[in-house]
């Protein structure tokens, strides 16, 4: 028997043994992962993400991927000479813009991600919320534009119809369950269909949160471009409850785009998801560190 104990090899063995209780805990569970941000535009990070998803499937976890694509939609609209407008972070979406969004999300991005997973040795099925009537959407109510955009006479904020922007109203998980049971990985574009038969563009975080709740997922992961939720001194907050989030929003610790993300997390855990995690998608294999190590790698939100 060899007596050469390579420290690096021993460290790898210790990592595997540390993962054992988590492998046992999560076997057969469902994880919903919202994939977006910087990681989508970096081939190395995209490869790392695909490998992580395939590994989860290989160890008996059912990953369900929901992806975004706002920057890609913006680039395509610019190339086509179509102006982009936003209200409260939501894209004003007319019929033409909705068609472009569906083309980019359900076409280019979705199939590219399926290909990354295939290259990593997995089998993925690319779908959108329209397939099988999975996501029935309702139109998002008109929004008040920022105060800078006001009626010239009254000075009141102008109410803007966002067009074909929706949010999940009902979710049928049959298609997702069928794909998972077949040993494959669902990759879902955030597009839904309304009762009126119209196509609606849905915020990817919102879509992922609603799907996680409908599935009763063990985890919802939101991959972002920040380490997680930070306090005022920029230290990572590793464990939060809904009451903590309300307090942090009230005192200004969290603001901007982080607020709707955390609202999604709170809704998900209150509607059936066991826990949610906000973590840095720019860090290679951050999701594996969060799942399989005691220290974790992001901010965990529980009810």
UniProtKB/Swiss-Prot annotation:
Chief localisation class: cytoplasm
SS bond list: none
Sequence similarity: Belongs to the acetylglutamate kinase family. ArgB subfamily.
Catalytic activity, reaction form: N-acetyl-L-glutamate + ATP = N-acetyl-L-glutamyl 5-phosphate + ADP
GO biological process: arginine biosynthetic process via ornithine; L-arginine biosynthetic process
KW Cell wall biogenesis/degradation (keyword) present: no
Protein name from the UniProt record: Acetylglutamate kinase
Record localization: Cytoplasm
Pathway(s) of this molecule: Amino-acid biosynthesis; L-arginine biosynthesis; N(2)-acetyl-L-ornithine from L-glutamate: step 2/4
GO terms under cellular component: cytoplasm
Keyword entries, A-Z: Amino-acid biosynthesis, Arginine biosynthesis, ATP-binding, Cytoplasm, Kinase, Nucleotide-binding, Transferase
GO terms for MF: acetylglutamate kinase activity; ATP binding
Alphabetized Pfam families for the sequence: AA_kinase (PF00696)
